[in-house]
């Protein structure tokens, strides 16, 4: 720098991502100065947003609502990427999504693709029936492959209402029956007073969610009501109008927690609906031919209604002979119809 008079000066050295350094110098003539800057880095504490392994005899993983919100799932199948060894991948909702725990088999081997039947799904203490799910045509079709009796379709389970999930990969407790290859225990949110809304859109699907909670009372007698609705419209390939899938789920849940000096009681009633609105799938090349007769027609109707109740009582004194009791009951009605018509022409070989 030219034109400086002799005297004392303060030099300040600064650069992005480096600590600023100030030096006092006495200027008497020309001189050279070198200054080494130290990187300015701040190390934050490790933050893990993933599933938590339970420390116990059974191999199980617990997924909280914070981890669920982090990955922004479209269906329950997206949560499996939080399990040990899970891989993140784009959601494909054009075909049923089946769980595969404690098994190396996949849907690629159709003769042994029934491992998902051995995994029990529990929602708020009640089992999810997976023994009468058709989901697709019972034979080859231009509108989809066959996935009959392959297990619970995870596309039907809305993730927005989930508070936490426990996935047991080891041997589950004896109180859970009708399972051979794992347990998925889902607990949904209860209470709260906020209005929640969610919209998600990508190249293949659009999702809308709206939910509201109500609660009143005190710790001795607390009552809650939760209501929600979720709509999903998926198109795996915009060029294939036949490979689409639409789902509507709604839920109304009532809960009551009572507490006195001796016992803690909990009572809940759930009303749930799941519907798939594929309806009649169409394709210009298949619906209209030169003879005026379609090659194939396809119509699917799926509606599921369920009512469940649960009651539990627990002693606040662990030294008493009676400690706890829990009972649950549920009724489910499913209407799953698939109507398919194919044109078959006879010819000479």
Predicted regions mapped to residue ranges:
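Transmembrane beta-strand segments of Gram-negative outer membrane beta-barrel proteins
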Residues: 46, 159-167, 174, 182-183, ...
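Transmembrane beta-barrel wall of Gram-negative outer-membrane proteins
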Residues: 196-233, 239-286, 291-326
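Short acidic/polar hinge/loop motifs at secondary-structure boundaries
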Residues: 3, 126-168
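Short Pro-Gly-centered beta-turn/loop motif in secreted/extracellular proteins
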Residues: 2-8
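N-terminal periplasmic accessory domains that precede
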Residues: 32-36, 76-79, 98-100, 122, ...
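Extracytoplasmic beta-strand/coil segments of soluble accessory domains associated
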Residues: 81-132
